[in-house]
Amino acid sequence: MLQLHPSDIKDIILQGGVIAYPTEAVYGLGCDPDNDTAILKLLAVKQRPWQKGLILVASDFQQLLAYVDESQLTAEQLEFAFSKWPGPFTFVMPIKAQVSKYLCGEFDSIAVRVSAHAGVQALCRALNKPLVSTSANLAGEDPALTAAEILADFTGKIDALVLGELGEQRQPSTIIDARSGKILRNGQ
């Protein structure tokens, strides 16, 4: 498994690679959200059913517009999300018709976050698009908190490990339904 800095990882992701990378709280697994083969590989590595859906993480909201149908949200709903970003808040928003079922699972919505983590922002800026994001662990296990855990659990299963530090968060992000305002998961 290659161990690289965020600026060196773009080609691996765009060629269908699955990576592990530090986020605000834990290591994440990620891939290109426009590559179903890469998404299926990520799901297989994590042993996660596609029906559950995944999160997209971005450096800014503009990167999410290819996936989120903002026309189904009011100005107030969008402003609430914008008031929390960048930061540890994930919003479930309506999807555009062309979004892969492997991203949204069995839902008509997708979970999205604008990250405050410098490494995640650098990855997304280098890609000029969001990154699939899910915690780096097998389904039901605790997420990885160190590069050593990634190397132990995922060597031979993923294509690269992005070097860097975890953020200051110690809890997963809060997940909020953007349409109803309902908190689906309390985090931070």
Swiss-Prot record:
Domain of life of the source: Bacteria
Keywords: ATP-binding, Cytoplasm, Nucleotide-binding, Nucleotidyltransferase, Transferase, tRNA processing
Sample GO molecular function, one term: double-stranded RNA binding
Keyword Nucleotide-binding: yes
Alphabetical GO biological process terms: regulation of translational fidelity; tRNA threonylcarbamoyladenosine modification
Entry's Gene Ontology cellular component terms: cytoplasm
Catalytic reaction list: L-threonine + hydrogencarbonate + ATP = L-threonylcarbamoyladenylate + diphosphate + H2O
Compartments it resides in: Cytoplasm
Residues covered by the YrdC-like domain: 3-188
InterPro entries per record: DHBP_synth_RibB-like_a/b_dom (IPR017945), Sua5-like_dom (IPR006070), TC-AMP_synthase (IPR023535), TC-AMP_synthase_SUA5 (IPR050156)
Listed HAMAP family: TsaC
UniProt-listed PANTHER family: SUA5, THREONYLCARBAMOYL-AMP SYNTHASE
Family: Belongs to the SUA5 family. TsaC subfamily.
Full protein name: Threonylcarbamoyl-AMP synthase
